[in-house]
């Protein structure tokens, strides 16, 4: 299993740095965990976006899904012609939120580009040789951490979360922990994020 961090900026992209987006590859399987602002450009440096096997979105904040709109265009206007719908896994209601920002025609095109699967906390999904487990964490509404398993390797991507039992449970046994550390230590406890010390 190979992890490529495509973006780790908080809320908005910094100069030269995209928002949340992480590529996990194993064999011929390529899974994108979150697809925030600027991620698609960075993805294109390491993988043709049309080669993705699936996309997983952690929650309803735009800095974690903004480039899904650009990905839809990449799939629709691929040189080989429109591609089959790409599996898109996300919490209940998030796709509706994403579609609501578009015109009726735009929402229709978005729905055609993706095979939408609304995840329930605890759900286990197989994508090629990878197993992805959706683990509830504490941020806003339904927010999911993703545990990706490949043979004996176990990666935990916490997504945005406060420190608590939920994220500890998700991270237990991880070979690699990719953790939210948005808040400076001086702001610990002021928002549903972890500090570097907590992470």
Please give the residue ranges for each predicted region.
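Conserved beta-strand hairpin/beta-sheet module of binuclear metal-dependent hydrolase folds
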Residues: 1-50, 143-159, 176
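Active-site metal-binding loops of divalent metal-dependent hydrolases
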Residues: 8-9, 36-38, 60, 93, ...
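Active-site metal-binding motif and surrounding structural segment of the metallo-beta-lactamase
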Residues: 38-87, 173-175
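Conserved Rossmann-like nucleotide-binding pocket used by diverse enzymes
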Residues: 56, 133, 157
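Active-site environment of divalent metal-dependent phosphoester hydrolases
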Residues: 62-65, 123, 140-142, 162-166, ...
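Metallo-beta-lactamase
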Residues: 84-87, 91-143
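Cap/insert and terminal regions of metallo-dependent hydrolase folds
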Residues: 162-199
